């Protein structure tokens, strides 16, 4: 499965310079570290996130993450699962309470190397490290009820694409990640209409 993922990332066309450089970094770690799918790798490990949109693709689910003290996309650690799409769907279901989630495409929607500062989790010190993140475009019905995952989030909701950017307190995400995801969503929808 790891080789399949490497091939998929090799074929991925970067959207911008950030993705171009991050693609190289992710491939380097995948090729050179056997434990890259486990958070026991204290330098870097694979994570999967999603841009979870509604049926009309004009709203996205954002959760207020306790750890980051900010609204953020949904996602999590691969923890040994070498299929990041499955991880993104699983995490989206766990964090939102939604069960009707589907992938709009099985392809990688976006990729990023995310710097994580040292922090305390479950009363344990976690050193600074990198998340080698693959993002997937997922969809759910916005009339179905959302449910807070209390051990991770304190609020969750559907937000307009612009609101999703503005409610985040994480500057790097507000400037570099969420606007990029919205731009890519717009291009994806235009391509799908052709």
Question: Where are each of the predicted segments found?
Answer:
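N-terminal strand-loop-strand
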Residues: 38-73
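Generic N-terminal amphipathic, Lys/Arg-enriched alpha-helix
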Residues: 1-13
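Unchanged
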Residues: 79-172
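Acidic, metal-coordinating catalytic segment for phosphate/diphosphate chemistry
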Residues: 11-49
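Generic secondary-structure boundary/loop-capping signal
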Residues: 34, 43, 68, 75, ...
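Charged phosphate-binding loop/patch that engages nucleotide di/tri-phosphates or the phosphate backbone
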Residues: 169-194
